[in-house]
Structures are given as C-alpha cells and as structure tokens.
Amino acid sequence: MRYTILSKGDSKSNALKHKMINHMKDFHMVEDAVNPEIVISVGGDGTLLQAFHQYSHMLSQVAFVGVHTGHLGFYADWLPHEVEKLIIEINNSEFQVIEYPLLEIIVRYNDNGYETRYLALNEATMKTENGSTLVVDVGIRGKQFERFRGDGLCISTPSGSTAYNKALGGALIHPSLEAMQIAEIASINNRVFRTVGSPLVLPKHHTCLITPVNHDTILTTIDHVSLKHKNVNGIQFRVANEKVRFARFRPFPFWKRVHDSFIESEDGR
C-alpha cells in the first residue's frame, strides 16, 4: 500500500505523523507523496481540504482518511489514540470507498474566451474586491433567474452544506444527493430590489451562470483558497463529474457526523 501523510503543521500533528510513519514501516508500507493510493490528513478539516486540493488532479486514484487533532473534524473519522488501529486496518482490510459530490467552478474572462477551472470540496463564494455591494445576474439552465444585490453568494456541495452554507441558513444535504446549493450572503431586499431570499438546491444536470454587473474584479474563495479575478465575464457552477473518495474502515453515517458536530458528541461535549 502506497501512502502519504499531510500534517497541519503544529507540534501535536507533526508528532502524530512521525509516529504513524514509524508504525507503517513495521508493516512495510511505502511512503509515496507523488503517487499514493491513500492520503491521510492529520489535523482538522482545513488540513483535509489542503490534502484534497493537493491531489485533486488524481482523485480517481486516491482515497482520503482524516485523523483529527483539533476541536472539530467533520471529515475526520479517527482520533489520535486510534492511529495504531487505523494502520492495522489499512494493512489488513479491503477498505470501503465512499464517494462525495464536488463542485465545478469555471471562471470565464473577457480576454479571448480564456477560462480557468476549479474544484471545491466544500464551497465557493463570490464577493467584490473592496467589500462593496455585489451586483450580479443569476442564470439557471441558460435562463435569467434574478439580479442579486448583496454581500455575496455561497455555492456549496452536499458535504459542504454543513460549513459556511449552514451559517447562512442553508439546508443540510446528504452527500448521496448529487446537487449544489446557492445561499445568499446578506442580500438587499426592499421595494426596489428583490431576490428570491431562500437557498436554492440545484440537481446535477442544472448549471448556474453568475454574471457580474459593472464589476471589473471579483473575489472568490474555493474552499480555503482566496483568489482575485480581473476582467470576469461570468462564473459557471455545476456538480462536477469527478468525486472525492474517502476510505472507510468502519461505519460513520453522515447524520451521526452532523449530530456529533453540532448537537452532542459521544463524550457529551
């Protein structure tokens, strides 16, 4: 089994990473950061997001596992005291692969049809560069839906629906549903300006094209990465053809993750 381990970088996570590497040597596992079969993140959800983006070019070949050393690990199945058990499972078991939908983002520019493509595990957001009101036309399946005015828009995956989207009042969507969700960030609604005012859930075969109105520069976030785009013609969102693969060695249902993360964990916290 070829593996690689990405650490959050703090002393606790680094120590755990080195401990795991030493244990894996006992099982003759091969550390391979270029062509791994399994990618283990040690830290929190942010560390797993970094691991996802580092290996997003080979998603069909790798499976991810999270060991969380922080306060909240929605994507992390394993705790520090369980790493020896995890290593034994990796060595001895044919692990189950769980696939989650991803978000495809295509930024189109006014420069000769140039465009860039991104993938998000959690969400993407759109805002203005200087914090002024974002004014955009929102199109769904090639038809004008609304003109949005507000602080911004958040477009999330089902697994990402528990992150920024939840804070915006969006719905929690089970990752077995191939969909994306559009949530408003502080929209302007009055007698003059009007938006739908509710999150929208779009199925896989629907695309959403968001076109800036009188904005030269758009600030986006793709998960944890902030990007500035100039001369934007439009940004298209849809459910990606690719999926992220998680290695499961024991059951950890989505709704149990939600319960443990937001209501009460098993240790009563």
From Swiss-Prot:
**In Gene Ontology terms, what is one molecular function of this protein?**
NAD binding
> What residue ranges carry the coiled-coil annotation?
none
Instruction: Kindly list the cofactors needed.
Output: a divalent metal cation
User: Looking at its record, which EC class is this enzyme?
Assistant: transferase
Name the Enzyme Commission number(s) assigned to this protein. Answer: 2.7.1.23
**Residues that, per the record, bind NAD(+):** 45-46, 122-123, 149, 151, 186
Instruction: State the compartments where it is located.
Output: Cytoplasm
| Gene Ontology BP, a term | NAD metabolic process
Reaction equation(s) it catalyzes: NAD(+) + ATP = ADP + NADP(+) + H(+)
Where are the catalytic residues? 45
Which UniProt key words apply to this protein?
ATP-binding, Cytoplasm, Kinase, NAD, NADP, Nucleotide-binding, Transferase
A GO CC annotation recorded here is: cytoplasm
NCBIfam families given for it?
PRK04885.1
Matching PANTHER family: NAD KINASE
Q: What does this protein do?
A: Involved in the regulation of the intracellular balance of NAD and NADP, and is a key enzyme in the biosynthesis of NADP. Catalyzes specifically the phosphorylation on 2'-hydroxyl of the adenosine moiety of NAD to yield NADP.
Q: Which family does it belong to?
A: Belongs to the NAD kinase family.
Which protein are we looking at? NAD kinase
What is the native source organism of this protein?
Staphylococcus haemolyticus (strain JCSC1435)
